[in-house]
């Protein structure tokens, strides 16, 4: 099966990718057998873009993805990331000095079991290292044949411009969904101007927009959402009105709420490639079903209004400080 394709800068990928993070962390206990089967099913369905990072599962996610694609490497546009460091207590910081960038790349290549990475993202911007140093190192990795293209994640517009002046930014990864629209003010227009693709993660609002989460009590102790302001019991209850509206519109169209939410993100432009994450084939197939779903202008307008007045911040304050730099 083939899916429509889109372009991220000069890189051609399937119109929808697969986020693999949840297979190894953040959303409860993983099942490697089902995760590998999900990756294989994604490839069977025509998904080419697989997304991981060195920090997911402390390297375990890259290893899992590497095992899954060992005999199917030629079918995959492989994306991974560097730049988030965590201490023993789980506190998060960013690092982007040249030596570290190159070290991380070599380590990711080894974990993935590949000789090159197709799209290598700077996961977070290091406020203590000039972006020019980080991107100079990425340009050298391209020259060495270790990576094909370079991207940014959660960077601000000014930083995107500075990085792009050193070496072309192929893609900008950021959270973008019906209830997270921060990038629309300045970052998305900057990407459009510079010919940079956008890869929205959590396009389903970390699962909330599917309608499957109606109470904070559903979130287990290993579920990162339990620590996010929007998923507190009070805010989650207030935000259920958003899901009710999406579900009603989806029912009219004969699709699921999640499919409608994904189609809204996809409608943002031919340079936009969402990467909904899942570790189960059932949800994967629902998501891929949205890849060819086109919304009417009226549907888009109705959905645009849904995200106004979301209760709760996207991240706790200490994490919010790390995005948009």
Language-model region placement:
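Glycine/proline-rich, positively charged
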Residues: 88-182, 186, 197
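Terminal-tail/helix-coil boundary detector
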Residues: 193, 221-252, 267, 271-272, ...
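Conserved, mostly hydrophobic/aromatic
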Residues: 18, 35, 50, 65, ...
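Short, well-ordered coil/turn segments that N-cap beta-strands
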Residues: 11-16, 46-48, 72-76, 114-118, ...
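N-terminal binding-site loop/beta-alpha segment at the start of enzyme catalytic domains
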Residues: 1-76, 323-324
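Active-site beta-loop-alpha junctions enriched in small/polar residues
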Residues: 21-23, 53-55, 81-85, 122-125, ...
